[in-house]
Swiss-Prot record:
Reactions performed catalytically: GTP + H2O = 7,8-dihydroneopterin 3'-triphosphate + formate + H(+)
One of the GO BP terms on file: tetrahydrofolate biosynthetic process
Positions with biased composition (Polar residues): 7-16
Family to which this protein belongs: Belongs to the GTP cyclohydrolase I family.
Annotated InterPro entries: GTP-CH-I_C/QueF (IPR043133), GTP-CH-I_N (IPR043134), GTP_CycHdrlase_I (IPR001474), GTP_CycHdrlase_I_CS (IPR018234), GTP_CycHdrlase_I_dom (IPR020602)
A single cellular component GO annotation: cytoplasm
Enzyme class: hydrolase
The keyword Coiled coil is annotated on this UniProt entry: no
The protein, known as: GTP cyclohydrolase 1
Keywords: GTP-binding, Hydrolase, Metal-binding, Nucleotide-binding, One-carbon metabolism, Zinc
EC code(s) of this entry: 3.5.4.16
Domain of life: Bacteria
Length: 229
């Protein structure tokens, strides 16, 4: 029933030669290098750099010493990269789909990501597991990972990230069922405050059959738990 590799469980007869929708341009790769001089860049680098200098001075540091001289610029580039998903539409990665007479679970597991907690602006990192029940069309498996990557690049809480990914897949693929399980470690719990390294936050979002049918829910959670073990 399934073709299984290191990262996916998917239909073995998936035919990528029968496009149903291909009206948009090929999806762009999520940028990891940020050009602060690019005319389309909406990040105010100067304001971030000024704010970082203020923070350094406020904690008693000298922002003009050798080790910190370029830190404000580095931090500005980092924020531009980490928050690149704010102005983008991650759903565009799901625009191209393929006709496929397959109605069982498609699961992509262990999609690594890094996002930023909106409460302390500290990173949380982990893995997402995505499953869906197709309704006559499937999407390229890598596109699910691109959705996670792009949704992650914004300040947020893990709960919102989980629901955003689930809603996108349900809406854009008209999936009969969607399950998204996210597990991550939060820096705001491990390096400050309660300081509990190793603690793990687990969130889930169920849609369609995975939410309403106990048997379908149990099946997909069993596959995800096997994948995560």
């Amino acid at each position: 029933m399934f073709r299984e590799s290191d990262n996916t469980i998917a239909p073995s007869n998936q035919d990528l030669n029968k496009p149903v929708v291909d009206k948009e341009q090929p999806a762009e790769r999520t940028p990891f290098f940020v050009d602060k001089n690019a005319p389309h860049n909406e990040v105010d680098f100067a304001r971030i750099e000024s704010a970082v200098r203020e923070i350094l001075e406020a904690v008693g540091e000298d922002p003009d010493r050798d080790g910190l001289l370029e830190t404000p610029e580095r931090v500005a580039r980092m924020y531009a990269e980490m928050f690149a998903g704010l102005k983008s539409d991650p759903g565009r990665h799901l625009a191209k789909v393929f006709a496929e007479d397959y109605d069982e679970i498609v699961l992509v597991r262990d999609i690594s990501f890094c996002s930023m907690c909106e409460h302390h602006l500290l990173p949380f990192t982990g893995k997402a597991h995505i499953a869906y029940l197709p309704s006559g069309k499937v999407v390229g498996l890598s596109k699910l990972a691109r959705v996670v990557e792009e949704v992650a690049r914004r300040p947020q809480v893990q709960e919102r990230l989980t629901h955003t990914v689930a809603n996108l897949i349900e809406d854009r693929l008209s999936a009969r069922g969607v399950a998204v399980v996210v597990e991550s470690t939060h820096s705001c719990m491990t390096m400050r405050g309660i300081r509990k390294p190793g603690s793990l936050c687990l969130t889930s979002a169920m849609r369609g059959a995975f939410k309403t049918d106990p048997k379908s829910r149990a099946e997909v959670l069993g596959l995800i738990n096997r994948a995560a073990s």
